[in-house]
Amino acid sequence: MTADADPDATETDDDAGGPAAVDDERAADLAAAVEAGEKRVHALEDHADPDTAAAARRLLVEAQSGADLASTGSYGFPAERAEPNIENMIGTVQIPLGVVGPVDINGGALDDERYLPLATTEGALLASVNRGCSVINRAGGATARVTKSGMTRAPVFRVDDVAEGLALVEWVRDHGDKLKAAAESTTNHGELQDVTPYVVGNNVYLRFRYDTKDAMGMNMITIATKEACELVEAETSASLVALSGNLCTDKKPAAINAVEGRGRSVTADVVVPQEVVENKLHTTPDAIAEINTRKNLIGSAKAGSFGFNAHVANPVAAMFLATGQDEAQVVEGANAITTAEVTDDGDLYVSVSLASLEIGTVGGGTKLPTQSEALDILGVRGGGDPAGSNADALAEAIAVGSLAGELSLLAALGSRHLSSAHESLGR
């Protein structure tokens, strides 16, 4: 396991090329050997190159399921490139990729016009987001800023009673420098920002928060936190129960992420002139503001939703897939609040604040060929200068894409064109 994804790294093998030539005879032999119990399906790369191993698994699955996996096996890069990302590979799932924009972004890290890449199977999504981008451009562009940054891991410790729990809390507060030194000894790039303790009976949760620069950083901070936990166990009477105690909180709906943030907290906003709302969105600022209040705020509150928005998960998921993010973290990425109000001049102010956008531009799926190209579209591939700036720029781009999507959908509801838009596009 590697502790770091280098925030300063940029992929050098830009030409991914196609898959390696498959040894069909060898693939057939391997599939037969698995069927006979002579070889294990997960260990075929020990006996052939990755593309031939994938072909052998396809033959095996086709024989047992009756499925035709010709499209699954038709992919455009060497299977070796995906070895850090998947086990038991048989091919790829191809999702249509499109772009919206270019949209004018006035960000702290991204200050330019950019096309936004979105990968989805939902028809009408890009048309809707693209309309929002067009309106944003007519309004002079959107402003976006990362307001908070820090990836978290929260181990849980067992203590005898609450008194011992409070003693651990005091120890953590008194030994922050030692915890920081232990955690940062495992990484060249991650920086421990703070540790927040939570006591529940005889359980103590320590929520470690790190600056992970341009990496999403879960691998990095898990290794760093393990080192810090060993220090806690060595110097206190607490016993580590689990390196993740679910107060992190990763890949689950959680109020702590919505309130405290996780990854990057980012806001994008725009003031749309009244005439643009009326002429391009075919509704009024008052109508959009009322819909947002009654739908996104009151309706979401009544539903007990953590997402006070219309469909932020749509552009977040589409840009996650396009750029090689961890798709399961859309759960946290959609923690967003949309606001809309009429200004004193009668124009429309709209904002989207995403509390927990867990993203990176190095490591993980960002190294895959098409995902790297999508990051190139945004100009944020690899490590930024200064470190962390590329991931900040990606966060701002996703926030503006989400803003465009919210603006367009709220307008469609205001003009009562939502169903007709789907009908006209045949979706």
Predicted segments, located by residue:
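Hydrophobic alpha-helical scaffolding
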Residues: 75-76, 89-90, 169, 218, ...
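Acidic/polar, glycine-rich intrinsically disordered N-terminal extensions of enzymes
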Residues: 1-114, 148
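Glycine-rich anion/phosphate-binding loop at the beta-strand->alpha-helix junction
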Residues: 214-367
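Internal helix-turn-beta structural module
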Residues: 349-427
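Small-residue-rich
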Residues: 93, 98-199, 206
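Conserved phosphate/anionic-ligand binding catalytic regions in large, soluble enzymes, centered on
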Residues: 91-127, 212-221, 300-324, 402-414
